[in-house]
């Protein structure tokens, strides 16, 4: 319940303050990592206590294993993934992302260039609150140019880097994109999701499921 509440708060923060703020305040906070560790311990204890393997309850066993793998994927992302911020103004291009490590900020060079064509902010009718914001981009990579759009639920993938719409400049002439490069953590997490689907199917149609009993 507390973990779910944390995810809900993170979603709210991400919508109104940007992805970077949600990561700093919730996703990468010590309390959130503690909750994830306790969830892993809880999944293991439940699997042992109810003897899922001994009773051949493979569906539930796979589901619990998938949750553990998903959380391990999140930990791998935190430890080994590269996180940064790309700030760019309309009509400008850059290949530099700002990476913060403690109190120190360094700049890493991307193997391609990103150009901001236009930033668009949409507000709720009769309100100053943003309902969505979108970046229209040109990505110059390997001698070719890609025309891309990044907004709240549309992520850009280029050479292992993922770009998320995070924030924008007060004058609405510039965008802030959250950049993530995390192939290992992402693959572990996707494996966990695949196992989750398999586990749910086994729980429904397996030999010891309620439907087959």
Region spans (language model):
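Solvent-exposed, non-transmembrane regions of integral membrane proteins
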Residues: 1-213
